[in-house]
Amino acid sequence: YKIFNIESARSLPNLPEGHPCKNIHGHSFKIKITVMGAVNEETGFVMDFSEIDSAFSPIFKMIDHAYLNELDGLTNPSSENLCKWIWAKLIDSLPNLKRIEIKETESTGCIYEGKIHG
């Protein structure tokens, strides 16, 4: 797996009035991208970490220091929806993708294991 640190702002518009997360607020997200597969006998890797970096780089540029609600497909950017959104953007370039985990604080987060590609 590889962990990326993202600074982003969001609001969760579908929450009831008075809920603090309905307001614009920020998080220092930790996004953990996990791949799974057989170990390549020659390299000793399941996947080179640089491949994960390359696949995630365009997404990182979109979401780091961004207001997530303004991104296409993220009008309600809960951590769960952000996981699904990232999965959809990564699965074609990372067919061994197994799991996306997002921590929004040290004690809260979510894990998404979407459909396996193919």
Model regions and ranges:
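Charge-rich, low-complexity N-terminal segments
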Residues: 1-118
